[in-house]
Amino acid sequence: MDADFDFVVDYDVPDKISYKIELLEKFVGKDPEAVLIFYGGEPMLCIEEIRQIMDNVKAKQFNIQTNGLHLNKLEPEYVNRLSTIFVSIDGTEQLTDYYRGEGVYRKVTENIKAAIKNGFNGEIVARMTLMEQTNIYPNIRWLLNNPDYSFQSIHWQLDAGFWKNDFHKRPFPEWVNEKYNPQIRQLTEFWVNTMETQGKVLRLYPLLGVMQSLLLEEESLLRCGSGWANYSIQTDCHIIPCPAMNGMKDYYLGHIQHSHPLQLKKIYVTEPCTSCKILGECGGRCLYANITQRWSNEAYSLVCETVKNLVDSLKTSLPRVKTLIDTERIRLSDFDHLKYNSCEIIP
């Protein structure tokens, strides 16, 4: 994976939609199962465009990934039509504000509660971004049960492998080995214990998605769906395999004016993922990171070790979970979730 690839990047991709909504309406109309996800940047900075799209484009459902700061500015008639809201929050107030700025945690939780009060009854997913200041186990426990807003669904993503020159500036190896990996095992134990004691499968997406595959004995492609089930539309109409690949011209897969959403080229992960022993269980960690290879082999292998640790912890717990299903303490259907909804599953 040691590489320093050059990519043709279009730095002139506009900040906001530069095409007529009718063009998007026609494109999406070719797929009767289309799901639209508002993604950024921060999509709530383009509220008028969100309104226009929801008013005119016929999609099976609408979802959004947002920092949550402007959620109160979109009228309930639109918010309540969203199926899933992914909101960026990293754990406790102290940790979230450390990463995102003073007052962010309080504003986000207030906006979430207001949305629910105004009639939103879809799924709200806490989307955590993890760096070395995060202790994942206590922060997930906090998000699940706290006096501000207790989340029913949580996902987390490691901020690792996305930048070229940050690895040597960070205590990433120490954090992985001393904090993150041990706490993932602790979290898995808590997750299964909750099934045993409460008969409840908590919607912790990285655990939920992989455990379902283990139970069904199925292998998976890239679990977020990027490049083969999910595609992103740039503000200039070009179609890319992953929203993180904005402006990467070598990976433009079409244009909404003349492409068909069900006939787009598929892009899959390559090495080092394709020779990995757990590829079928993992599916690949991130298409953008796999293609750009910002970190060295040695550095990125630590990221892969976090995935192997997560998968191994779930495999270790698999017999207990099967027993709980056999004894009807929980059901296999408790692991059902909407796939390819922009939740990466693999952190």
Language-model features, listed with the residues they occupy:
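Radical SAM/AdoMet-radical enzyme domain recognition
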Residues: 21-37, 46-159, 173
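Short, compositionally biased "basic patch" segments
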Residues: 1-6, 11-23, 82-84, 88
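Radical SAM enzyme [4Fe-4S]-AdoMet core and its adjacent flexible, acidic
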Residues: 6-9, 18, 102-109, 113, ...
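Radical SAM enzyme core and accessory elements
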Residues: 236, 271-347
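N-terminal pre-triad scaffold of radical SAM enzymes
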Residues: 1, 33-37, 237, 276
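Short acidic/His/Gly/Ser-rich catalytic and metal-binding motifs that mark active-site loops
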Residues: 1-5, 94, 162-167, 285
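C-terminal accessory region of radical SAM enzymes
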Residues: 178-214, 238-290, 320
